[in-house]
């Protein structure tokens, strides 16, 4: 089913809306937990839903390699396979393919690479990505693109962006040929170069997509460059389509993305950091394995309503971490996922109440940090 995006309110550049799918409605701005292999690590779908998650991200590349398209089709699709009945967005596999480094070769046709699981030679292109994502039953399909690395010269970024545009057209054409009833998002590339981002936006909007992602950020560039590119690019994207910042990020990155007009985010950070004992709280981050928490009988965050904070102390979580108990990673993950969803709920409420700037000021004050200036404030 084609999604319906309703933009309900703006507060500065911050946007408050909702994505309406057949499988449910997603309030935006929204954060999507990452379920790379068809699971948010250590969590049941019910537990993920209880944290407030409305939509998940799955990984086309990894699910193609394991368990493969045939197994997926035996179950129906990814929703049935993992028992998550809400909406799912899948990335195209491009980022993972390009992360393989020396074991892959990029051509105009697509990417030849060795399967990192068993060493077999395999090939992925725009058409194959569209076919896999149709079999996954993805509610939002991402085009196959090249994620421009950082650093890249202007010429390198230009060639990469132009090839991504050609692949975007191939993705669109094959998506339509397959008669996929769901939704296809374009991905803006161009590195840190504003003129290349302009060309990418123009080309993608001429092809026409159901939503638009900003890709190729959070790949090592300075935060100032990420903010500058976002602030330049977002106003050029269609007002009536959702905007998705891929692979981002820290809580501060989510706030800065919303300040610049982003509606959707995903990142492995809350789950990966949870397994490493880095826990997000109202004032910043707690490193639970530090000895200072051994005798601390208070919860992680008195403001948090998650299962972990309502039932366990820092001392207990420290103990679990020190003993490498699986329960520790699970309780940490529940907390971090809930923190991210509470952050998004607070952002949505602040936009609804026309006090987003006040929210941003308070968010940074709790971290004893200055609010990063917008480009217009620097002028």
UniProtKB/Swiss-Prot annotation:
Q: Answer whether the UniProt record assigns the keyword Zinc to this protein.
A: yes
| Positions with a binding annotation for Zn(2+) | 304, 306, 309, 335
Q: Does the keyword Zinc apply?
A: yes
If you read the UniProt record, what top EC class would you report for this enzyme, in one word? transferase
Q: Look up the EC number in the record and give it.
A: 2.4.2.29
Its domain of life?
Answer: Bacteria
Q: Which reaction does it catalyse?
A: 7-aminomethyl-7-carbaguanine + guanosine(34) in tRNA = 7-aminomethyl-7-carbaguanosine(34) in tRNA + guanine
Question: NCBIfam families, from UniProt?
Answer: Q_tRNA_tgt, tgt_general
Question: Under which name does UniProt file this protein?
Answer: Queuine tRNA-ribosyltransferase
Native organism is Vibrio cholerae serotype O1 (strain ATCC 39315 / El Tor Inaba N16961)
Q: Point out the gene that encodes the protein.
A: tgt
């Amino acid at each position: 089913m084609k999604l319906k995006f309703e933009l309900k309110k703006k507060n500065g550049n911050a946007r408050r809306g909702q994505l309406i799918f057949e499988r449910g409605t997603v309030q935006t701005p929204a954060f999507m937990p990452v379920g790379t292999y068809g699971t948010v690590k250590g969590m049941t779908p019910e537990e993920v839903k209880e944290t407030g998650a409305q939509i998940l991200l799955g990984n086309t590349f990894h699910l193609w390699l394991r368990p493969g398209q045939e197994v997926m089709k035996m179950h129906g699709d990814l929703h049935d396979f993992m028992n998550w009945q809400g909406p799912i967005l899948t990335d195209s596999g491009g980022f993972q393919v390009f992360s393989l480094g020396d074991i892959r070769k990029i051509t105009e046709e697509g990417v030849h690479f060795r399967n990192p699981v068993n060493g077999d030679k395999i090939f992925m292109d725009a058409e194959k990505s569209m076919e896999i994502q149709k079999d996954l039953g993805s509610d939002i399909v991402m085009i196959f693109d090249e994620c421009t690395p950082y650093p890249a010269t202007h010429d390198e970024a230009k060639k990469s962006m132009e090839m991504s545009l050609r692949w975007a057209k191939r993705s669109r054409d094959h998506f339509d040929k397959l008669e996929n009833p769901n939704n296809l998002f374009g991905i803006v590339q161009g590195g840190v170069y504003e003129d290349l981002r302009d060309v990418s936006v123009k080309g993608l909007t001429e092809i026409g997509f159901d939503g638009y992602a900003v890709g190729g950020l959070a790949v090592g560039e300075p935060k100032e460059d990420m903010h500058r590119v976002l602030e330049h690019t977002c106003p050029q994207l269609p007002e009536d389509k959702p905007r998705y910042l891929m692979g981002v990020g820290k809580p501060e990155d989510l706030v800065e993305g919303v300040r610049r007009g982003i509606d959707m985010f995903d990142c492995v950070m809350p789950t990966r950091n949870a397994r490493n004992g880095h826990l997000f709280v109202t004032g910043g981050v707690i490193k639970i394995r530090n000895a200072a928490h051994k005798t601390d009988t208070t919860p992680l965050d008195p403001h948090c309503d998650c299962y972990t904070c309502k039932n366990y102390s820092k001392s207990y979580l420290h103990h679990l971490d020190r003993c490498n108990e699986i329960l520790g990673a699970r309780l940490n993950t529940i907390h971090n996922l809930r923190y991210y969803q509470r952050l998004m709920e607070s952002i949505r409420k602040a936009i609804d109440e026309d006090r987003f700037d006040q929210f941003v000021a308070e968010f940074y004050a709790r971290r004893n940090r200055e609010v990063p200036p917008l480009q217009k404030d620097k002028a």
